[in-house]
C-alpha cells in the first residue's frame, strides 16, 4: 500500500502501474474538502515514485464520484472571498499535479461522475466508461459554476459548443453521448472496465498511443478562430439570456468566463475561473439553490425512512378517469405499478385512456421508448365501468368531482369492494380529509393524496394525514408516490391542506390589488419578471380555472372565515359570472388561442377590462415594490401559520412543497429561505405598512418573536474553517 486515506487509497497494480481508488466509508464517493486534501497527499506519494509508468483512477462504489459534498457548500460560501479563492487555488493545484504527472493516466468511470467528479476525470489523459455512465457539470443549477477546472478543460477537450451546452445548462450526458462528443474515449461492460483501462494504459506506456499529445490541448489556449468564437459565444449568451434570465447569474457568468479564458493557457484560464466562481458563491441565489438541493435530499430521506418497513403497492386503482385520472394512471403504470381505472361513464374512460396514450406517444416521439414498451405500459392500465379487479388492489385513489357528497358516496361504495387492508386515498384539493373519512367504516385506512396538474410534470404529491389515518396507511401511500417518481410531503389535515391553503391568500392579495385599482397585466409582469414566478396570478388563475378557483375560494373562506371571508365581489366572481373560466374555454383574464403545436397561447382581451371595472376602483399606478409586498405577505404569513399549527412539519418541507407544487421561484429558495434572506425584522417592518388591509396582512406572533430576537427559520450555518485548516482536513 503506497497511501491510505479515509476516502481513498493508492497501491501498485502491476509492472509500474499504480491505482488510485476512491472508497469513502459511506455508500457513495464525494469530493469533499477532506478528499481533495487526501488526493493531494496521494499525488505527492506518486510524484516520489521513480518507477511509476502509469496511473489508473477508479472507484470501489457503484458510482465513480457523485460530485462535491454539497452539505459543505453553505459553510464554504460564508468564508471570506479571499480565503475561498485561496482554497480553490489549492484544490486546483491538486488537479494540476494529477494532470502533470510524467506518466499516462486513465480514469475508469462507472455510474455517476458529476461536478467535482467530472472535473477530476477531466484532469486524466484518458477516460473509459461503463454503459451506465452519467457525466456532467451541474454547478450552474446550484447558482455557481465549475470551480475545479471544468470550465477550462472541457472546452479545450470537446470544443466550445459542446462544452457550453453542458456547462451553461448544468447538464449531464450518458455514455453514448459522452463518447460521441469526446468526453470519454471508450465504453465497455462493467466487468471489463479495469481490464480495458489497463490495456489502454499499456498502449500509452508502450508508445502506441500518444498520451502527451492528448494532454497538450488542455494546457493551451482554446483553438478557435475569431469568427468561430464570435458565433459560439454570441449564440450561447443569447440562449442563456432566454432560458436562465436575470435571476440566475451563474450560466451567463460561466459563458463569459469561458469566452474570456479562451485566449489563455491553463494557469491564467484557471485564475479567471476562480475570479468568477468566488462572487457567485456569495450570492443569495447560490445559497437558495444549494438550500433547495439539501431540502430535496432531506425530504426524500424522510420519505425513505418512513417507508422502510412497508411494502410498495403492487397493484393500484384510480376512481374517476378523465384528464387527472388518466394522468395518475399513466404515471403509476409508467413507473411499474399496474392500475385499474374506473369510471361510471364510457366517455370519461376513453378520455382517461387517451390521456395515458398521448403521454406514452410523447415518450415514443422523443425516442425514450419503443412501440413494444408503449404497448406493454398501456396494457397495465385496465379501464372498467365496474369494480372488477378491485379485490386485488393495494391502494385506491379517488379523483372524482370536487364535491364532498359525491366523494363520500364513491369512497363508501369502494370500501365495500376492496380488501380490509386496502388503503383508500382522495385526490381532493381542498376538502378536509377527516370530513370525508366520516363516510367510511375504516377511516384508519384512509388519507389524502393530492396530485398537481399536469400529473406527469409536477413533482409534488401532498399526503394528507386525517385525524384517524394510521401510520401504516400514510407509509403505504408515501411508498406509492415515491415509486411513481414523485416527491411526497406529509401534511396534517385542514381546508386546502398546505399548498392550496397558502395559495389562496396570495390570490386574495391579488384580488385586493385589483379592487384598489391595480391592473392585472402589470401585476402579472411584476410577479413574473421581478419576483420570478413562472406565471403571474392572473395567468395562473386562468390555468387553474376560474370556476375551480371560485369554488375553492368559497371552501377556504368557510374554513378560515376570519382571514379568508370577503365582504365584496371580486375579479374572480366577475369572471365566473361572465362564464370566463380561463384556458379551459379560452376566456379568462386573458384570451387563449392554440398555437401551431396545439398549445394555448395568451392574448390581450380588452373585454375583460369592462368586467373588472365593475368590481374595481378607478385605475391607479402601483410601484413594483408595493405589488410584490401586497402579493407575497398574505402567502408568507399563511406559510408561517401552517408551520406554527403543525400543518407542515419543517421549513424545509414547506419550501419544497412551494417550489415543487406552485413553482415558487427556486432562486428565492422558498418562503422560509426568502424570509431568512430578507430578515424577519425587515419583513415585519414591510408587513406593518399594509396591516390596515386586513387580517391576511397581520404577521403571526411566532414570526414577530423571530423578528424581535433576529432568529432565522433555518439553523444558522457557521463559516468553514480557514483555508489552511481546510487543506489538511
Curated annotation (Swiss-Prot):
UniProt keywords, alphabetically: Fatty acid metabolism, Isomerase, Lipid degradation, Lipid metabolism, Lyase, Multifunctional enzyme, NAD, Oxidoreductase
Active site per the UniProt annotation: 450
Reactions performed catalytically: a (3S)-3-hydroxyacyl-CoA + NAD(+) = a 3-oxoacyl-CoA + NADH + H(+); a (3S)-3-hydroxyacyl-CoA = a (2E)-enoyl-CoA + H2O; a 4-saturated-(3S)-3-hydroxyacyl-CoA = a (3E)-enoyl-CoA + H2O; (3S)-3-hydroxybutanoyl-CoA = (3R)-3-hydroxybutanoyl-CoA
Site (Important for catalytic activity): 119, 139
Function: Involved in the aerobic and anaerobic degradation of long-chain fatty acids via beta-oxidation cycle. Catalyzes the formation of 3-oxoacyl-CoA from enoyl-CoA via L-3-hydroxyacyl-CoA. It can also use D-3-hydroxyacyl-CoA and cis-3-enoyl-CoA as substrate.
NCBIfam families: FadB, PRK11730.1
Annotated positions binding substrate: 296, 500, 660
Region (Enoyl-CoA hydratase/isomerase): 1-189
Chain intervals for the UniProt region annotation (Disordered): 708-729
Disulfide-linked positions: none
Positions with a binding annotation for NAD(+): 324, 343, 400-402, 407, 429, 453
Single GO term (MF): NAD+ binding
UniProt KW RNA-binding keyword: no
Its EC number(s): 4.2.1.17, 5.1.2.3, 5.3.3.8, 1.1.1.35
Family according to the record: In the N-terminal section; belongs to the enoyl-CoA hydratase/isomerase family.
Region (3-hydroxyacyl-CoA dehydrogenase): 311-729
Lineage summary: Bacteria, Pseudomonadati, Pseudomonadota, Gammaproteobacteria, Enterobacterales
Biological process terms in GO annotation: fatty acid beta-oxidation
A Pfam family recorded for this sequence: ECH_1
Origin species: Escherichia coli O81 (strain ED1a)
The protein, known as: Fatty acid oxidation complex subunit alpha
Pathway assignment: Lipid metabolism; fatty acid beta-oxidation
Amino acid at each position: 500500500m503506497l497511501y491510505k486515506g479515509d476516502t481513498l487509497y493508492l497501491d501498485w497494480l502491476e509492472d509500474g502501474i499504480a491505482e488510485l481508488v476512491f472508497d469513502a466509508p459511506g455508500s457513495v464517493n464525494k469530493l469533499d474538502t477532506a478528499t481533495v486534501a487526501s488526493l493531494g497527499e496521494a499525488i505527492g506519494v506518486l510524484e516520489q515514485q521513480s518507477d511509476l509508468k502509469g496511473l489508473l483512477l477508479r472507484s470501489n462504489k457503484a458510482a465513480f464520484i457523485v460530485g462535491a459534498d454539497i452539505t459543505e457548500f453553505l459553510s464554504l460560501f460564508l468564508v471570506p472571498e479571499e480565503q475561498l479563492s485561496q482554497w480553490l487555488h489549492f484544490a486546483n493545484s491538486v488537479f494540476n499535479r494529477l494532470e502533470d504527472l510524467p506518466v499516462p493516466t486513465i480514469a475508469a468511470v462507472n455510474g455517476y461522475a458529476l461536478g467535482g467528479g467530472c472535473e477530476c476525470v477531466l484532469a486524466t489523459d484518458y477516460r473509459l466508461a461503463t454503459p451506465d455512465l452519467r457525466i456532467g457539470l451541474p454547478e450552474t443549477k446550484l447558482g455557481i459554476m465549475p470551480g475545479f477546472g471544468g470550465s477550462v478543460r472541457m472546452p479545450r477537450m470537446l470544443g466550445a459548443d459542446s462544452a457550453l451546452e453542458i456547462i451553461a445548462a448544468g447538464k449531464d450526458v450518458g455514455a453514448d453521448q459522452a463518447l460521441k462528443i469526446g468526453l470519454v474515449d471508450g465504453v465497455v461492460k462493467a466487468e471489463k472496465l479495469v481490464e480495458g483501462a489497463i490495456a489502454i494504459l499499456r498502449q500509452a506506456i508502450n508508445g502506441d498511443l500518444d498520451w502527451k499529445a492528448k494532454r497538450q490541448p488542455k494546457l493551451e489556449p482554446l483553438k478557435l478562430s475569431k469568427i468561430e468564437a464570435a458565433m459560439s459565444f454570441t449564440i450561447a449568451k443569447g440562449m442563456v439570456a432566454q432560458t436562465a434570465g436575470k435571476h440566475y447569474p451563474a450560466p451567463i457568468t460561466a459563458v463569459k468566463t469561458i469566452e474570456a479564458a479562451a485566449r489563455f493557457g491553463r494557469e491564467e484560464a484557471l485564475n479567471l475561473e476562480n475570479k468568477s466562481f468566488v462572487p457567485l458563491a456569495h450570492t443569495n441565489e447560490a445559497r437558495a439553490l444549494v438550500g433547495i438541493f439539501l431540502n430535496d435530499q432531506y425530504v426524500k430521506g424522510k420519505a425513505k425512512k418512513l417507508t422502510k418497513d412497508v411494502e410498495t403497492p403492487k397493484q393500484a386503482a384510480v376512481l374517476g378517469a378523465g384528464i387527472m385520472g388518466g394522468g395518475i394512471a399513466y404515471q403509476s403504470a409508467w413507473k411499474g405499478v399496474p392500475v385499474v381505472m374506473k369510471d361510471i361513464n364510457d366517455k370519461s374512460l376513453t378520455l382517461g385512456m387517451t390521456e395515458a396514450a398521448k403521454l406514452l406517444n410523447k415518450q415514443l416521439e422523443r425516442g425514450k421508448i419503443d412501440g413494444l414498451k408503449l404497448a406493454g405500459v398501456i396494457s397495465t392500465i385496465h379501464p372498467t365501468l365496474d369494480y372488477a379487479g378491485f379485490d386485488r388492489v393495494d391502494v385506491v385513489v379517488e379523483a372524482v368531482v370536487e364535491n364532498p357528497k359525491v366523494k363520500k358516496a364513491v369512497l363508501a361504495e369502494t370500501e365495500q369492494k376492496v380488501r380490509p387492508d386496502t388503503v383508500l386515498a382522495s385526490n381532493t384539493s381542498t376538502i378536509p380529509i377527516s370530513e370525508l373519512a366520516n363516510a367510511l367504516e375504516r377511516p384508519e385506512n384512509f388519507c389524502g393524496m393530492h396530485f398537481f396538474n399536469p400529473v406527469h410534470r409536477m413533482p409534488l404529491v401532498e399526503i394528507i394525514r386525517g385525524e384517524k389515518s394510521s401510520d401504516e396507511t400514510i407509509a403505504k401511500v408515501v411508498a406509492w408516490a415515491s415509486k411513481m417518481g414523485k416527491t411526497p410531503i406529509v401534511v396534517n389535515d385542514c381546508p386546502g391542506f398546505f399548498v392550496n391553503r397558502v395559495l389562496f391568500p396570495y390570490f386574495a392579495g391579488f384580488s385586493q390589488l385589483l379592487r384598489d385599482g391595480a391592473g392585472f397585466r402589470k401585476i402579472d409582469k411584476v410577479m413574473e419578471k421581478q419576483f420570478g414566478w413562472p406565471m403571474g396570478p392572473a395567468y395562473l388563475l386562468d390555468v387553474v380555472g376560474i370556476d375551480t378557483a371560485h369554488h375553492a375560494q368559497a371552501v377556504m373562506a368557510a374554513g378560515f372565515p376570519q382571514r379568508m371571508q370577503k365582504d365584496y365581489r371580486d375579479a374572480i366572481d366577475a369572471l365566473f359570472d361572465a362564464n370566463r373560466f380561463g384556458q379551459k374555454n379560452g376566456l379568462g383574464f386573458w384570451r387563449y388561442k392554440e398555437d401551431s403545436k396545439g398549445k394555448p397561447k395568451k392574448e390581450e382581451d380588452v373585454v375583460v377590462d369592462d368586467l373588472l371595472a365593475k368590481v374595481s376602483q378607478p385605475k391607479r399606478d402601483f410601484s413594483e415594490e408595493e405589488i410584490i409586498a401586497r402579493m407575497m405577505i398574505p402567502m408568507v404569513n399563511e406559510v408561517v401559520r401552517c408551520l406554527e399549527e403543525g400543518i407542515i412539519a419543517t421549513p424545509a418541507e414547506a419550501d419544497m412543497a412551494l417550489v415543487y407544487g406552485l413553482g415558487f421561484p427556486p432562486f428565492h429558495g422558498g418562503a422560509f429561505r426568502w424570509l431568512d434572506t430578507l430578515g424577519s425584522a425587515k419583513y415585519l417592518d414591510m408587513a406593518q405598512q399594509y396591516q390596515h388591509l386586513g387580517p391576511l396582512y397581520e404577521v403571526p406572533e411566532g414570526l414577530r418573536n423571530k423578528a424581535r430576537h433576529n432568529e432565522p427559520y433555518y439553523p444558522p450555518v457557521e463559516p468553514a474553517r480557514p483555508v489552511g485548516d481546510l487543506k489538511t482536513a
